[in-house]
């Protein structure tokens, strides 16, 4: 039996917003499994907002580079330990160079990106520059993830303050439409282009939660089945791009807009700084003490 510590309870409470005793009980029932405890709280209706479960305090920036012909795009998340460093000019210059070189060389994974020359004919690599930056700034700097998109139509992008970045590929050259759709993806965070592309794992997980809540009503099985089916259908519309109301014209669904424009979204990618990354929390006094000790 796993010992449930106050730190575990604190983390679960921060990630779900549920009451302390509810968090402790959920951890006990799941033998300390944090993700299982989150699901248990959601089924019981104790989590205030499921979206909080994925939020973290990791810092950094999302950088994007687009080719001149708008046929290719490259995006990277570069992380730092603090927001202060994330706004540092040297850090930003490095991050921008990562995007520039990644686009130029057509890489699509972190290892290949780190191995790239920092300049076309340089013997120094991006990894060399990263290490030098760590020594210069005094914080751990990492290229967490990279991605690329290409299209014979157009690749558009949107960046929201360097915290959220989107690449989106259309099958037709429509720069205005692709920009609006990229902005929409940044704001609404759809999981897939269409409902039938939403992962089965996600659907089944949500279905279990809907079923658990519906069963608490005490209604007949056939009614519960209809309730769950309706909730799943509603969810699929909410999490798929084509089923969402367009951010610039809420009266129109994205799917209807695409039909009217005779366009198709081939793919999209959305990065948000710190998604899914756990960061050790420290209070201000601890940070000051750590800096003092580090300067001895």
Curated annotation (Swiss-Prot):
Main localization (coarse): cytoplasm
Record has Cytoplasm as a keyword: yes
Involved in Mg(2+) ion dislocation from EF-Tu: annotated segments: 82-85
Source taxon at top rank: Bacteria
Record key words, sorted: Cytoplasm, Elongation factor, Protein biosynthesis
Cell compartment(s), UniProt: Cytoplasm
Coiled-coil ranges from the UniProt annotation: none
Annotated SUPFAM superfamilies: Elongation factor Ts (EF-Ts), dimerisation domain (SSF54713), UBA-like (SSF46934)
GO molecular function: translation elongation factor activity
Known role: Associates with the EF-Tu.GDP complex and induces the exchange of GDP to GTP. It remains bound to the aminoacyl-tRNA.EF-Tu.GTP complex up to the GTP hydrolysis stage on the ribosome.
Protein name: Elongation factor Ts
Organism classification: Bacteria, Pseudomonadati, Pseudomonadota, Gammaproteobacteria, Legionellales
């Amino acid at each position: 039996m796993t010992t449930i510590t106050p730190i575990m309870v604190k983390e679960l409470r921060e990630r779900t917003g549920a009451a302390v005793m509810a968090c402790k009980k959920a951890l006990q029932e799941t033998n300390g499994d944090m993700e299982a405890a989150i699901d248990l709280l959601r089924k019981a209706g104790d989590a205030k907002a499921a979206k909080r479960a994925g939020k973290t305090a990791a810092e950094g920036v999302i950088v994007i580079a687009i080719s001149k012909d708008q046929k290719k795009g490259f995006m990277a998340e570069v992380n730092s330990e603090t927001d202060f460093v994330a706004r540092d000019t040297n850090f930003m210059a490095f991050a921008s160079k990562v995007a520039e070189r990644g686009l130029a060389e057509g890489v699509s994974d972190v290892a290949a990106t780190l191995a790239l020359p920092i300049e076309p004919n340089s013997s120094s690599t991006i990894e060399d520059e990263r290490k030098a930056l760590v020594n210069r700034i005094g914080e751990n700097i990492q290229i967490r993830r990279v991605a690329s998109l290409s299209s014979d139509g157009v690749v558009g992008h949107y960046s929201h303050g360097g915290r959220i970045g989107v690449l989106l590929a259309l099958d037709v050259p429509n720069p205005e439409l692709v920009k609006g759709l990229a902005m929409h993806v940044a704001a609404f965070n759809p999981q897939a282009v269409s409902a039938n592309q939403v992962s089965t794992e996600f659907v089944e997980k949500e279905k279990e939660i809907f079923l658990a809540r519906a069963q608490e009503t005490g209604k007949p099985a056939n009614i519960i089945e209809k309730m769950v089916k309706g909730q799943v259908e509603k969810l699929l519309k909410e999490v798929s791009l084509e089923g969402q109301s367009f951010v610039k014209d809420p009266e129109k669904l994205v799917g209807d807009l695409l039909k009217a424009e005779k366009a198709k979204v081939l793919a999209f990618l959305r990065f948000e700084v710190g998604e899914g990354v756990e960061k050790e929390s420290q209070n201000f006094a601890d940070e000051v003490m750590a800096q003092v000790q580090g300067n001895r």
